[in-house]
A protein has these predicted regions:
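Structural marker of alpha-solenoid helical repeat scaffolds
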Residues: 4, 38, 55, 72-76
Length: 106
């Protein structure tokens, strides 16, 4: 479909989701990033983008995706998605804080 010029947020979300299911977060992330570029209000795509980035070893980028998704979810009134992304974001924040050397925290 992409080769035929039929790009869209749903197609990119679906491709990203399938790559994630196959365990290939590195290939999933660009499709999910394109999904949110095509439809910035696509809450589910923000959530999956955060997951793909986290699984791909990009915690800072995952945190940014979750935060953007939380903003979208709040604006749209999607409380459940916002709560889920908030939980994932907090986990990443804790992991990042634990990885920081003590001298950086002062």
């Amino acid at each position: 479909m992409l080769a035929a010029g039929r790009d869209g947020a749903l197609l990119r979300f679906s491709l990203g989701n399938e790559y994630l299911k196959a365990g290939d977060a590195g290939r999933a992330a660009p499709h999910l990033a394109q999904a949110v570029a095509l439809d910035p209000d696509y809450t589910a795509a923000w959530k999956l983008l955060g997951k793909a980035l986290a699984e791909n070893g990009q915690p800072e980028e995952a945190l940014a995706a979750y935060r953007a998704g939380i903003d979208v979810a709040r604006r749209k009134g999607d409380k459940q998605a916002g709560k889920e992304m908030d939980v994932f974001a907090r986990r990443i924040e804790k992991a990042l804080a634990a990885d920081r050397p003590q001298s950086e925290g002062r």
